[in-house]
Amino acid sequence: MAEARRFSPVHELDVGQILSEARHRWLRPPEICEILQNYQRFQISTEPPTTPSSGSVFMFDRKVLRYFRKDGHNWRKKKDGKTVKEAHERLKAGSVDVLHCYYAHGQDNENFQRRSYWLLQEELSHIVFVHYLEVKGSRVSTSFNRMQRTEDAARSPQETGDALTSEHDGYASCSFNQNDHSNHSQTTDSASVNGFHSPELEDAESAYNQHGSSTAYSHQELQQPATGGNLTGFDPYYQISLTPRDSYQKELRTIPVTDSSIMVDKSKTINSPGVTNGLKNRKSIDSQTWEEILGNCGSGVEALPLQPNSEHEVLDQILESSFTMQDFASLQESMVKSQNQELNSGLTSDRTVWFQGQDMELNAISNLASNEKAPYLSTMKQHLLHGALGEEGLKKMDSFNRWMSKELGDVGVIADANESFTQSSSRTYWEEVESEDGSNGHNSRRDMDGYVMSPSLSKEQLFSINDFSPSWAYVGCEVVVFVTGKFLKTREETEIGEWSCMFGQTEVPADVISNGILQCVAPMHEAGRVPFYVTCSNRLACSEVREFEYKVAESQVFDREADDESTIDILEARFVKLLCSKSENTSPVSGNDSDLSQLSEKISLLLFENDDQLDQMLMNEISQENMKNNLLQEFLKESLHSWLLQKIAEGGKGPSVLDEGGQGVLHFAASLGYNWALEPTIIAGVSVDFRDVNGWTALHWAAFFGRERIIGSLIALGAAPGTLTDPNPDFPSGSTPSDLAYANGHKGIAGYLSEYALRAHVSLLSLNDKNAETVEMAPSPSSSSLTDSLTAVRNATQAAARIHQVFRAQSFQKKQLKEFGDKKLGMSEERALSMLAPKTHKSGRAHSDDSVQAAAIRIQNKFRGYKGRKDYLITRQRIIKIQAHVRGYQFRKNYRKIIWSVGVLEKVILRWRRKGAGLRGFKSEALVEKMQDGTEKEEDDDFFKQGRKQTEDRLQKALARVKSMVQYPEARDQYRRLLNVVNDIQESKVEKALENSEATCFDDDDDLIDIEALLEDDDTLMLPMSSSLWTS
């Protein structure tokens, strides 16, 4: 049934057809959305219109034209008499809010209205669609006018015949499909589009075609059957027949038939069998007079198989004729039978049946007109008023119409009907909200599939939300939300009640800061949209359900796009200024000092390794920006070479100096990405971990700016990855290079530095046991990024576990030393650390030991859970306080006895017996010294405990960053690139070492060859001498 109540979706809307229909009716939300989303196809007005007429539509840009409402018309004002009184409503397409709508009523002409629409979507919210239209009154007043015309028509048969002719002309051009009626007959008539009442023309249009509209129903409407209802013998859908059709038939004739979804396709209708004869008969009937029609009338109405359109026609003719109760009963029975037959058969009858039933319809009209008994006409009027426009009929009018009638003082009979038949507007509105949830159950579940549970509604609505700000918040942040609306209860009940707001499944208290304004704090939540509504601190929605969005915020120290460029430019300028600075006492490097000359040669060799780089730049075509960068680096190389030689010759600190801002050459090179400046500066005597004025090393600067190549070079040169900067407000205990990289979004660099710091910390531990497991080093370069990151997680986890194991062993050793009070009884450091290595087990007990160890780890993890640990600490603290109170009481109680006994002994023995001074001259300096020694030891222990706690926190943070690196593909790729950089640097070092060794080998081979040549020369010289001697 829920699927049957849903309207068919909007297919393709013809914007031209929509604009042509806008001259005579209000547009629906899907149509307005189509226009606003295609605003590029229309001309946007740059000036406000001057007294636009009814049916005018305009489009404005709110950012360009702010005062587009100044149109020259006199609109209804608020109580102050200055501000235009506009009502606001959010319109829906389906079940989603899509539009803002503002209504204004004319002061002089109350039927003249202005409606302004714009989308809720932020990208298109600046485009405004304004529609001016003069409505023709309300349903109730229209029905009374119809009654008056019916009485006049009963007295004037000629006018009735003319009206009948116009009726037939209207149906010839404005007939609706049978398939459309099959959907509408199962729903109730609703002229509201998301909470605003439409005039008569909109009622007619929405009754025939309700594609894409979002309609709210009450519980009575959902439970009402398709046939029958409160109007005995009539389908509730045909309450629209009470509106005068002669007013809008003329307007509908101007609309093209082929493009309208409510029109009959004339080409298909004419080609249908039996339709041609029907049209010919209709033309002949139109040309006849009323007397000829009455003369050609046939038998009665009892056997008339009425179709929906003929039923609509006959209902109007009933009002224009007199009839008997028997005829009315038979007509009622035939209508019910015809509707049941249509519903059971699926309404598959052809349009031909409609035309074939026209002759029978005319016969029924003539039969009713021949029985002129007018006394029953007033009875029919009362039946229609109390049935079609009674309590059930008025309940179908939406809440916004009643609110408009009450607040704006709408004129006409509709206001009186609302006041007489509606006891509580909020109660009826809430029933409609509940019925909307019930009728669109599948749709609502589909729209709210992101929520854990759909909001629960209370019995009545107590608060109406107009707007709330802000409508979103960042994840992990709490913001103050202001909700503006209207209390639907009295002031006393509002002040007594406890209000709250629901954000998803979290309820937070709300404060009433003014009449209709609530204030609450949005709780922290995951990213996404959650339902937002007001409750009475019972988790039940007592207001409309809106959406609140949580967005993800990128955590960065500053804006990378704007501030990085300016910071880099400033650092470059400071670097050039430092290199260009010359000291007063400049002495060149003397050639006598061999060490300085060798150092100068090494620096020159490293800086000018590629002398042909300028020639390559001239030969190859490169961009102008790259040319400038290369020329700047060549200039900086020359300046750095002369500056390093100058500082080496001066002696003292040498190159380990800082500029006016507190940074040195190594820091500038690391931050700017000048890899060629690192090794010469370090060879010149600057430490790799040389700190600036804030305690930052070169590795800190490289990690801060994300210099992957620089980080690999510094790690290869021996930089310490775990050094801490000076404390600052952002990092009270100092920050590591990993902290700076993570704060700037370089998660891959942070993961690599964290892993490297853990492995470096393990390598510092003096584990002398040969059976100790070794932590795996960096993975092979042929593996994938995911494999490398998983290997890093495994290495970091193993390193952190072993470090914690060492800490526990050391703390256990100190406890033993304190317990026995003798250092000889305690274990040595080497023995304590060697006990950490896993012992060799027998093959038979290995499996059982592993299972026992795994069980112990599970128990420890469960005990170390956050909540359990917190509860344990709270309970322990309470127990310690109780114990302290008890011990203090006991100590004071015993202390009094001791003081009394000591006082007696001191007076009796020391003073009276020995005639001495007693304890009055007693000095406790030795005791004080012992106590001071104990406090110093305790302070040292506290210091070590605090330091170890901070180290453990850093280890946990480093391990968490390595694990989080696996979740982000970009971080894994960055980690992979950094591994490749380190591997390339190591390979280049190995190749250089091999080249140097081969060069030395070649030199040794040359020396051997020379010795052999000398030996050969000696042999050639000795041979003639020996021969001469032999001959002699």
From Swiss-Prot:
Alphabetically ordered keywords of this record: Activator, ANK repeat, Calcium, Calmodulin-binding, Coiled coil, DNA-binding, Nucleus, Phosphoprotein, Plant defense, Repeat, Repressor, Stress response, Transcription, Transcription regulation, Ubl conjugation
Residue spans of the ANK repeats: 661-690, 694-723, 733-762
Sequence segments annotated as region (Disordered): 146-197
Amino acid composition bias (Polar residues), ranges on this chain: 174-195
BP GO terms, sorted: cellular response to cold; defense response to bacterium; defense response to fungus; extracellular ATP signaling; leaf senescence; positive regulation of defense response to insect; regulation of DNA-templated transcription; response to cold
Physiological role: Transcription activator that binds to the DNA consensus sequence 5'-[ACG]CGCG[GTC]-3'. Binds calmodulin in a calcium-dependent manner in vitro. Regulates transcriptional activity in response to calcium signals. Involved in freezing tolerance in association with CAMTA1 and CAMTA2. Required for the cold-induced expression of DREB1B/CBF1, DREB1C/CBF2, ZAT12 and GOLS3. Involved in response to cold. Contributes together with CAMTA5 to the positive regulation of the cold-induced expression of DREB1A/CBF3, DREB1B/CBF1 and DREB1C/CBF2.
Effect of gene knockout: No visible phenotype under normal growth conditions, but the double mutants camta1 and camta3 are impaired in freezing tolerance. No visible phenotype under normal growth conditions, but the double mutants camt1 and camt3 exhibit semi-dwarf phenotypes. No visible phenotype under normal growth conditions, but the double mutants camt2 and camt3 exhibit dwarf phenotypes. Reduced growth, chlorosis, spontaneous lesions and constitutive expression of defense-related genes when grown under 22 degrees Celsius. Enhanced sensitivity to insect herbivores.
Domain of life: Eukaryota
A Gene Ontology cellular-component term: nucleus
Family, per entry: Belongs to the CAMTA family.
Organism: Arabidopsis thaliana (Mouse-ear cress)
Effect of residue 855 to V: Gain-of-function mutant
InterPro entries named in the record: Ankyrin_rpt, Ankyrin_rpt-contain_sf, CG-1_dom, Ig-like_fold, Ig_E-set, IQ_motif_EF-hand-BS, P-loop_NTPase
All residue ranges annotated as the IQ domain in the record: 852-881, 875-904
Start and end residues of each stretch annotated as Calmodulin-binding: 900-922
Coiled coil: 945-987
KW DNA damage (keyword) present: no
Signal sequence bounds: none
Name of this chain's protein: Calmodulin-binding transcription activator 3
